[in-house]
């Protein structure tokens, strides 16, 4: 389709589609098409005109479907290495609801990071980078890890509406050796007063269910190190996030803490829920983030006047004209006649119409 025999083909791409072209229909969300990215994300997509990173040679160009973990059809797909002096930070479409809910309790859209997370190869080459500075850019992340070796994909997880960084990222190397070296070299380094944690990304789905905790009533002076001290006793903390006031930057007394195993999360709940921490004045509320999300959704539904499916509907009310007729009639009737009338009309409540 894209060979030299086709007059409309790109003769400089070695028979592959033009770089960044997704041959599979995706509703306009093709890789490398910044205009098709969700609002607030287009500025994070690198274009071929970027000068800080060299454009891949014709021998290494691939369509988006050919990259590992990106929904390729047939075979093992192409590779994004052999890029000479540089690579490009590919931003795949947004992660699926299930994947992102597992990661931060949010639902941000639909797309394809689940493939990358669930790819069996990802456990050996796909890394998660925690505790990134809030102002760190995708370019800086790429430059930091590209020094180790060729990269398939790298991306900082952000709120797609605001561009706000969640403080962690995924970096997928092309070789296991480079991913191992990245952990050994970059884990624990300090970047703008933030100590990075680099480790292998775990598969998504059931294996990380019930590991994310929602914590409230924390001291308003809580720090990352203090949160580690409080919760680190009960297991390996994969990710933590202290929520802060947007204006002052001070902690709001709320945090998310994700453990490596659900048993560790349950142990932390048993040990810390309703316990006053050192420096605090209120007992902590520690529960699963999923439970908090369900309670929040139920509260929102009640505020909107939406009745949950498991709540029975209210009993039927009498028509307005019958209620008005009863209101006029009962005034001239005795109590006995009112009771007799009401008994013959079980849906009427006399108190409502007095």
Swiss-Prot record:
Question: Where, subcellularly, is it found?
Answer: Nucleus; Cytoplasm
Xref: Gene3D superfamilies? 3.30.70.330
Residue span, RRM domain:
125-203, 211-291
Protein's gene: Sxl
Q: How does it assemble?
A: Part of a complex containing fl(2)d, Sxl and vir. Part of a complex composed of at least mei-P26, bam, bgcn and Sxl; this complex is involved in translational repression of nanos mRNA. interacts with mei-p26. Interacts with nito. Interacts with Unr; cooperates with Unr to prevent translation of msl-2 transcripts. Interacts with how; promoting nuclear retention of msl-2 transcripts.
An example Pfam family from this entry, by short name, is: RRM_1
Using the record, list the residue span of the signal peptide; answer none if the entry has no such feature.
Answer: none
Which SMART domains does the record cross-reference, listed alphabetically?
Answer: RRM
Q: What is this protein called?
A: Protein sex-lethal
State whether keyword Ribonucleoprotein applies: no
Which NCBIfam families does the UniProt entry name for this protein?
A: sex-lethal
The record, for InterPro entries, names: Euk_RNA-bind_prot, Hud_Sxl_RNA, Nucleotide-bd_a/b_plait_sf, RBD_domain_sf, RRM_dom, Sxl
Q: Its principal location?
A: nucleus
Region listing for Disordered, in residue ranges = 1-21
Q: Which organism is it from?
A: Drosophila melanogaster (Fruit fly)
List the expressing tissues: Expressed in somatic tissues, but not in the pole cells, which are the precursors of the germline. Expressed in the anterior of the germarium.
């Amino acid at each position: 389709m894209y060979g030299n025999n086709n007059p409309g083909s790109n003769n400089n791409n070695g028979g592959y589609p033009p770089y960044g072209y997704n041959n599979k229909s995706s509703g306009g969300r093709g890789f490398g098409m910044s205009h098709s990215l969700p609002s607030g994300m287009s500025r994070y997509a690198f274009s071929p005109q970027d000068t800080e990173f060299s454009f891949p040679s014709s021998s290494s160009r691939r369509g988006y479907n050919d990259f590992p973990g990106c929904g390729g059809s047939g075979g093992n797909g192409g590779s994004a290495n052999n890029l000479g002096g540089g690579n490009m930070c590919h931003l795949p479409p947004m992660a699926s609801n299930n994947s992102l809910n597992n990661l931060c309790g949010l639902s941000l859209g639909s797309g394809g990071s689940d493939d990358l997370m669930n790819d069996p190869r990802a456990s050996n080459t796909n890394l998660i980078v925690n505790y990134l500075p809030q102002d760190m850019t995708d370019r800086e992340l790429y430059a930091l890890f590209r020094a180790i070796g060729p990269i398939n994909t790298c991306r900082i997880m952000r709120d797609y509406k605001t561009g706000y960084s969640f403080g962690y990222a995924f970096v997928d190397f092309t070789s296991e050796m480079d991913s191992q070296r990245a952990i050994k070299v970059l884990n624990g380094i300090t970047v703008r007063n933030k100590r990075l944690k680099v480790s292998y990304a775990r598969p998504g789905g059931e294996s990380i269910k019930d590991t994310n905790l929602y914590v409230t009533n924390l001291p308003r002076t809580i720090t990352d190190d203090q949160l580690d001290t409080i919760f680190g006793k009960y297991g390996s903390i994969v990710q933590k996030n202290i929520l802060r006031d947007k204006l002052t930057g001070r902690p709001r007394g709320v945090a998310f803490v994700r453990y490596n195993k659900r048993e560790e999360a349950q142990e932390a709940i048993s040990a810390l829920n309703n316990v006053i921490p050192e420096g605090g004045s209120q007992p902590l509320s520690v529960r699963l983030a999923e439970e908090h999300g369900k309670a929040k959704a139920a509260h929102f539904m009640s505020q909107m006047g939406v009745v949950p499916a498991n709540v029975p509907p209210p009993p039927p009310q009498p028509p307005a004209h019958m209620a008005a007729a009863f209101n006029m009639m009962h005034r001239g009737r005795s109590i006995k006649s009112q009771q007799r009338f009401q008994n013959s009309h079980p849906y009427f409540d006399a108190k409502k119409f007095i």
